[in-house]
Amino acid sequence: MSKSYTLKAEVRERVGKGSSRELRRNGFIPAVIYGDKQPPLAISVPYKEVFYKIHGGGFRTTIATLEIGKEKIQVLPKDYQLDPVRDFPMHVDFLRVSAKSIVHVNIPVHFLNEDTAPGIKRGGVLNIVRHEIECTAPANAIPDAIQIDLSSYSIGDSIHISAVQLPEGVTPVIQDRNFTIATIAAPAGMGDTSEEENNESDAKK
């Protein structure tokens, strides 16, 4: 889990496109805090700090503490909007959380030992079906990533969720099927390895 961080925020007295543009000109981003059965709270947060948090990775899986005057609110970033041309953050949604909160998060998948995987060493290609897995997790123990070790996978193998050891308290949202996360596909022209081996065996008889 990434280390929690603190952002200073201010309550927005005005909302709307005009006030949002003015905030951005002054180095801030409009944002909203919602959840925990409380009314939404319109705030502004520093542009520069949020920009680096978003593009540094782990933004939506890391708890933040928003300091608004003397009040401190624990939140989890749930969504953000980027400028379609310049990739600048335009707006952020924060969810109120506590140590007991269970949240829905999309956790990125990281593949380990790709260079030593038997299937890839033989020319196979890692075909990633899911770059993220939607899970429920304790708000204070969200993993930065779900790690999958490829060192035992060969060409033709599929990696299903049942083969992945998830951290304690983390549960995939999809429960009705053993979904595929990735496969080791044969390179073009190689064909099915098991079929070729059977044909060779038949020829020797």
UniProtKB/Swiss-Prot annotation:
Cross-referenced SUPFAM superfamilies: Ribosomal protein L25-like
Pfam family, one: Ribosomal_TL5_C
GO cellular component: cytosolic large ribosomal subunit
BP term (GO), one: translation
Keywords: Ribonucleoprotein, Ribosomal protein, RNA-binding, rRNA-binding
InterPro entries: Rbsml_bL25/Gln-tRNA_synth_N, Ribosomal_bL25/Gln-tRNA_synth, Ribosomal_bL25_b-dom, Ribosomal_bL25_C, Ribosomal_bL25_long, Ribosomal_L25_dom, Ribosomal_uL5_bac-type
Molecular function via GO: 5S rRNA binding; structural constituent of ribosome
UniProt superkingdom: Bacteria
Keyword Transmembrane helix: no
Keyword presence, Nucleus: no
NCBIfam families: bL25_bact_ctc (TIGR00731), PRK05618.1-2 (NF004128), PRK05943.1 (NF004612)
Family according to the record: Belongs to the bacterial ribosomal protein bL25 family. CTC subfamily.
Subunit structure: Part of the 50S ribosomal subunit; part of the 5S rRNA/L5/L18/L25 subcomplex. Contacts the 5S rRNA. Binds to the 5S rRNA independently of L5 and L18.
Protein name: Large ribosomal subunit protein bL25
Source organism: Bartonella bacilliformis (strain ATCC 35685 / KC583 / Herrer 020/F12,63)
Native organism taxonomy: Bacteria, Pseudomonadati, Pseudomonadota, Alphaproteobacteria, Hyphomicrobiales
